[in-house]
Amino acid sequence: MALNSSTEDGIKRIQDDCPRAGRHSYIFVMIPTLYSIIFVVGIFGNSLVVIVIYFYMKLKTVASVFLLNLALADLCFLLTLPLWAVYTAMEYRWPFGNHLCKIASASVSFNLYASVFLLTCLSIDRYLAIVHPMKSRLRRTMLVAKVTCIIIWLMAGLASLPAVIHRNVYFIENTNITVCAFHYESRNSTLPIGLGLTKNILGFLFPFLIILTSYTLIWKALKKAYEIQKNKPRNDDIFRIIMAIVLFFFFSWVPHQIFTFLDVLIQLGVIHDCKIADIVDTAMPITICIAYFNNCLNPLFYGFLGKKFKKYFLQLLKYIPPKAKSHSSLSTKMSTLSYRPSDNMSSAAKKPASCSEVE
């Protein structure tokens, strides 16, 4: 959406260079429906994840701390999703005022960064737990995990500030509607390109490279360990899990990141064609649905890689309350296999534990 502005009576009025871009009847029906599904599934699933980790698993492990914070970040975002559903169903007419516009927009940005940062830290933790279990024991503590999560929330909050500052309610004169949108006073401004590149690089590229590297090193270490033990089926299981984790992250976010970059080019006036603007504005909410639906499934996806999580999750669904006294040992490895390949790899007698165990 390319916008030009003027101010009257304290209300920002803008002109939309491509007023019909992204405005299709099927979008106004399909997207609110998808948002509603994401809201129901996400609230239900992430609430159960919080209950399982906090009340059943007792939040005793590093991985559970990251997973709990991941679910909480998703819940914060999901609470604002009904606003976006109504906004889209009303054909991009924002009825909730400027403050909720800023809060809802910041929540979307916050969830993006918090979730990606937490998944990145989770991959690093899995790498340390599997490949360097003894060396990392002193670093992989509950205190370090909690401090890391606090830092992540602060960083995500800082990354969301532009939404609080620059996202506002505007009145589009040539379409006679009120929207909640980003608007930049000058097309020569470096702000939109800076925000777009930050989202592309800090919100996707760097985290993806770290996640890819971490799980590649994990797979190599486990492959070596299982070759020593001649356990090929086990090695194949690990490879599939790791590939699923990496590809799940990649394909969830790539479409949204691509169209975010194109949207920046439109805002800067690099792209003038309204047909391209229409494609971008039409595709953007669809890519958001893909990215954030998968995002909200992440806690369940990662949690179900662990046998203990699955056990407690099924107990919760059957209304079986948590035991008053927690188990003395608790799996913390997510897709990590309580087996530690760096511990006496040459010992063929040592049998690896479940490859899907979440320590």
UniProtKB/Swiss-Prot annotation:
PROSITE patterns given in the database record: G_PROTEIN_RECEP_F1_1, G_PROTEIN_RECEP_F1_2
MF (Gene Ontology): angiotensin type I receptor activity; angiotensin type II receptor activity; D1 dopamine receptor binding; protein kinase binding
Entry-listed glycosylation sites: N4, N176, N188
Membrane-topology descriptor: Multi-pass membrane protein
Major localization listed first in the record, in broad terms: membrane
Domain of life: Eukaryota
Pfam families in UniProt: 7tm_1
Residues that, per the record, bind angiotensin II: Q15, D17, R167, F182, H183, Y184, K199
Bias kind Polar residues: ranges: 335-347
UniProt PTM comment: C-terminal Ser or Thr residues may be phosphorylated.
Disulfide bonds: C18-C274, C101-C180
Gene Ontology cellular component list: basolateral plasma membrane; cytoplasm; dendrite; endosome; Golgi apparatus; organelle outer membrane; plasma membrane; recycling endosome
Transmembrane parts of this sequence: 26-55, 62-89, 99-125, 142-165, 191-216, 240-268, 279-304
GO biological process terms held by the UniProt record: blood vessel development; brain renin-angiotensin system; cellular response to dexamethasone stimulus; dopamine biosynthetic process; drinking behavior; G protein-coupled receptor signaling pathway; gene expression; heart development
Subcellular location: Cell membrane
UniProt-annotated stretches for the region Disordered: 335-359
Keywords linked to the UniProt accession: Cell membrane, Disulfide bond, G-protein coupled receptor, Glycoprotein, Lipoprotein, Membrane, Palmitate, Phosphoprotein, Receptor, Transducer, Transmembrane, Transmembrane helix
Extracellular face of the membrane: 1-25, 90-98, 166-190, 269-278
Family matches, as PANTHER family: CELL ADHESION MOLECULE, TYPE-1 ANGIOTENSIN II RECEPTOR A
Family of this protein: Belongs to the G-protein coupled receptor 1 family.
Subunit relationships: Interacts with MAS1. Interacts with ARRB1. Interacts with FLNA (via filamin repeat 21); increases PKA-mediated phosphorylation of FLNA.
Functional description taken from the UniProt entry: Receptor for angiotensin II, a vasoconstricting peptide, which acts as a key regulator of blood pressure and sodium retention by the kidney. The activated receptor in turn couples to G-alpha proteins G(q) (GNAQ, GNA11, GNA14 or GNA15) and thus activates phospholipase C and increases the cytosolic Ca(2+) concentrations, which in turn triggers cellular responses such as stimulation of protein kinase C.
Protein's recorded name: Type-1 angiotensin II receptor A
Organism: Mus musculus (Mouse)
